[in-house]
Amino acid sequence: MSPEAPIASPPDCALSNPSVKDARRGHGLVRWVPETWFGHWFLGTNVWSRYAVEVALNDLARLMPDSARRPLRILDAGSGPGVSLPLLDRIFSPESILAIDINPKEVQRSGRQAGLCRCEVEVRAGDATELDLPDGSVDMVLCHQLLHHLVPQKEALAEFHRVLAPGGTLLLAESCDEFISSIPVRMLFRHPNETQRSATGYQRLVRDAGFILAPDCVETSTPFWSLPDWGLRQKLGWKRPAGAEPTEVAGAAMKPWE
């Protein structure tokens, strides 16, 4: 999710990173941070679509709990350029997908991807923290690389919990603070650094929102594209230190059955 951020009252934390000062409006703080031109460009690359989105969705499908509701109605929250839409259609065979993004330009890009889907797809502009959807109206929410762009993360998760039907699934994949705080990412992208979390922190956030996230439904990883050297040293035989923080976390959480 990207540009022209709406205004909000100051959240729980302050945005002190110089890279986001230009995202302030008036006396309030933005609810999310607009992406850089490089970030927009990167979302259109093969690295993003193949190694970030496709790999994540296949992993998330594998992590889904057996007791979860069948995902007939899917919400893709923060759909960006929409490369996830054909993948959601192929992997889960839903009846319908609703894709939302706060950036109208990304909505246009998602609309082009919607034409590649077999199921019914609606693409619209929307705010993940204020979803214009009835309670219990979707069976699955995809939240892929969205929360680390948001300041009101708890509000977004509360909305996902509200619109999910009992037994519905939240598919969450996030880049962790270990990656977001690295020098290359800080130079090329823009994020609200004060709200970044570790893999453990994201898992706690999801559970605190009322979701069930079983240990066997979550994984952490450090893919090559999340390393400063893009994995070159690993190809030469270097091994990451034991206990090093992962850069990515993926989990399939479930809203409890009532």
What are these regions (language model features)?
Residues 215-249:
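Conserved catalytic loop of SAM-dependent methyltransferase domains
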Residues 4-68, 87, 171-193:
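Conserved class I S-adenosyl-L-methionine
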